[in-house]
């Protein structure tokens, strides 16, 4: 038996708010691919998916504690007489920690000040929550994923520039950024 523990309300990570025009996975639009994969997972008999669940502790010999939020996200009326949370005590043969983090922060003095954010976080704020993270944005990058954020900011009418430490990039995302008038500064 397998447990898939996810702290969000649904599976998918950043694929949930990706721009389907720019991303395909196995020749499918990313949202179609994601829905297909989630349906495949839900149909597996030996798999239990725990959404809204946080792994709280990882002890010796693969003993884990997880807290599942069952009704905390519901209104008081909806959750009356319902269990709020469940504590899972898990003894696993094997554990795979797949945190999903691919972006690394820049290390510099005062990088924890307001307005200094990871590009993927900015993209989630603007595309998923509809929240602007400033009117003038500079994105510093060493790969093409930051161009997704730049394009999202640009589509919302925000001023954005990209500083790319590489000499150039011929990716579709970088080309699209140039075509949309986003200033790119190369190394």
Q: Where do the PLM segments sit?
A:
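Residues forming the flavin
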Residues: 1-187
């Amino acid at each position: 038996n397998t447990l898939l523990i996810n702290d969000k309300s649904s599976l998918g990570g950043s694929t949930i708010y990706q721009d389907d025009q720019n991303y395909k996975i196995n020749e499918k639009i990313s949202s179609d691919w994601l829905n297909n994969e989630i349906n495949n997972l839900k149909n597996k008999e030996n798999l239990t998916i725990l959404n809204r669940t946080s792994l709280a502790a990882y002890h010796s010999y693969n003993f884990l504690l997880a807290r599942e939020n069952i009704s905390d996200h519901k209104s008081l009326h909806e959750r009356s007489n319902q269990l709020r949370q469940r504590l899972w005590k898990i003894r696993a043969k094997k554990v795979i920690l797949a945190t999903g983090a691919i972006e690394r922060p820049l290390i510099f003095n005062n990088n924890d000040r307001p307005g200094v954010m990871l590009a993927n976080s900015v993209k989630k704020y603007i595309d998923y929550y509809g929240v602007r993270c400033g009117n003038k944005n500079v994105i510093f990058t060493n790969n093409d994923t930051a161009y997704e954020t730049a394009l999202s900011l640009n589509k919302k009418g925000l001023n954005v520039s990209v500083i790319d430490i590489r000499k150039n990039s011929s990716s579709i995302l970088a080309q699209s950024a140039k075509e949309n008038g986003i200033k790119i500064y190369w190394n």
